[in-house]
Regions:
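Class I SAM-dependent methyltransferase SAM/SAH-binding core
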Residues: 30, 36-86
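C-terminal helical/coil "lid" or tail adjacent to the Rossmann-like core of SAM-dependent
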Residues: 182-243
Length: 257
């Protein structure tokens, strides 16, 4: 289930991505594109005296997010169904805006940034986190495994997204007129000496994500079933005792002038 994969991913990456994310007491934070609340729980726990408004266009995802926050006993989050491009908030309503794994799915991420900046007060911060599937390297090397990742990227592009957007964060935020743009790479490396990362990231995050693209890749004619199965089998070798896997996320923080 995709919600389970997202929760596993968020838990595994919590310290790597959020160790330097904290919002002051009383601040209002917009989480745009909260999905099933996987990142929401981490944000709300790390900044218990900040108030979060978490929005998503999907009612189904919001229902799962509300349930997750309720189970966690967190009370500093309010959820609302909303389109990122038509946010139902007044100009300058928020002190901070947080966006994680959202821009990669948008046909026009450049158009999303002005919509987010409209509701951010002058001097407020925008934090954006994205991956970049072109940064995936693994051993044993396999052209068949690499092809499955390329199929994931192509399927995402066919849906209007960009699986390589991490490398573009700096120019995107600069072009949007943001100041003090700082982008930091967050590296994941997994081998058998780091079993938590092998299981939590290589298996349950990355390989699970690639496997989730099977239906789209086959439907689009990007690959046949036999080649897909062979590629996935080879990719899974990176999670064995002699395998290794590395990947880079990008975290950008900037301010509205």
């Amino acid at each position: 289930m995709e919600a389970t994969r997202l929760a596993d991913q968020a838990g595994t990456l919590a310290d790597l991505l959020h160790q330097d994310t904290a919002y002051p007491a009383g601040s209002r934070v917009l989480e745009a594109g909260c999905g099933v609340g996987a990142q929401t729980r981490i944000l709300a726990r790390r900044s218990p005296t900040a108030h979060f408004a978490s929005v998503d266009v999907s009612a189904e995802s919001l229902a799962l997010a509300r349930a997750a926050i309720s189970r966690a006993g967190l009370t500093n989050v309010e959820f609302q169904q909303a389109d990122l491009f038509a946010l139902p908030f007044a100009d300058g309503s928020f002190d901070h805006v947080f966006v994680c794994f959202v821009l990669e799915h948008l046909r026009q991420p450049e158009a999303a940034l002005p919509a987010l900046l409209r509701v951010l007060r002058p001097g407020g911060s925008l934090t954006v986190i994205e991956g970049d599937h072109g940064s995936a390297f693994f051993h044993p090397k396999s052209a068949r495994a690499q092809r499955t990742i390329e199929c994931l990227n192509q399927a995402q592009a066919a849906a209007g997204g960009d699986a390589l957007i991490g490398r573009r964060l700096y120019p995107l935020l600069r072009a949007a007129g943001l100041a003090d743009v700082q982008v930091s790479p967050r590296f994941v490396y997994a081998d058998s000496s780091r079993p938590r990362w092998v299981d939590g990231f290589t298996r349950k995050t990355f390989i699970a994500m690639v496997e989730g693209a099977a239906t789209s890749a086959l439907r689009l004619g990007l690959i046949d079933q036999a080649a897909w199965d062979e590629g996935i089998a080879d990719l899974k070798r990176s999670a064995t005792d002699d395998g290794t896997f590395c990947y880079t996320f990008f975290k950008a923080v900037a301010h509205k002038t």
